[in-house]
Amino acid sequence: MLNDGTGFKKVYIATGFTDLRRVIDGLARIIRFQFQLDPYDKNTLFLFCGRRTDRIKGLLWEGDGFLLLYKRIENGSFSWPRTKDEALEIT
């Protein structure tokens, strides 16, 4: 379980649209083959957003299994980058 939300060593934001019907294996495939990153990189959070910007998914490998996060906000929407030019690096 997610014990400490400040312990991420990296956070990657998948720009553009992601089909949020995908679950752990589908999101891990996107990470591996589309972004050429390792989904098993411990304490690295990968974030995805669909066409509806009121919900996002996160995937996190915790060393003993994946944690799939899902957030839907009731009012408003996330300001999600749709292109790499809109994305910022978070340090």
Can you describe what each PLM-predicted range is?
Residues M1-T91:
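Polybasic/polar functional segments that serve as interface/processing modules
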